[in-house]
């Protein structure tokens, strides 16, 4: 289990609150949604979330993503 995320990283995350983001997970899943909030462990809440598959999109709605499963968070196009 990884420790808390550094303060500069947490401050950078503020720029993405209330904007669409794409989250890539260790499992290979990709989830797109509006970043609502996060904590020091990078646990994040996404609004209007969708799981993006190879050939399909699954609507998830309000979703909690555990920080230890996150590989990268990028702005969604």
Curated annotation (Swiss-Prot):
Residues 8-77 form the Sm domain. The keyword Ribonucleoprotein applies. One of its GO terms (cellular component) is ribonucleoprotein complex. SMART domains: Sm (SM00651). PANTHER family: SMALL NUCLEAR RIBONUCLEOPROTEIN, U6 SNRNA-ASSOCIATED SM-LIKE PROTEIN LSM7. GO terms for molecular function: RNA binding. Keywords: Ribonucleoprotein. Gene3D superfamilies: 2.30.30.100. This is Putative snRNP Sm-like protein. Belongs to the snRNP Sm proteins family.
């Amino acid at each position: 289990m990884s420790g808390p995320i550094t303060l500069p990283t947490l401050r950078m995350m503020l720029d993405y609150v209330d904007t669409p983001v794409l989250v890539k997970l260790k499992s290979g899943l990709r989830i797109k949604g509006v970043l609502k909030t996060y904590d020091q462990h990078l646990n994040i809440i996404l609004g209007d979330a969708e799981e993006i598959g190879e050939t399909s999109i699954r609507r998830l709605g309000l979703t909690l993503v555990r920080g230890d499963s996150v590989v990268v968070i990028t702005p969604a196009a």
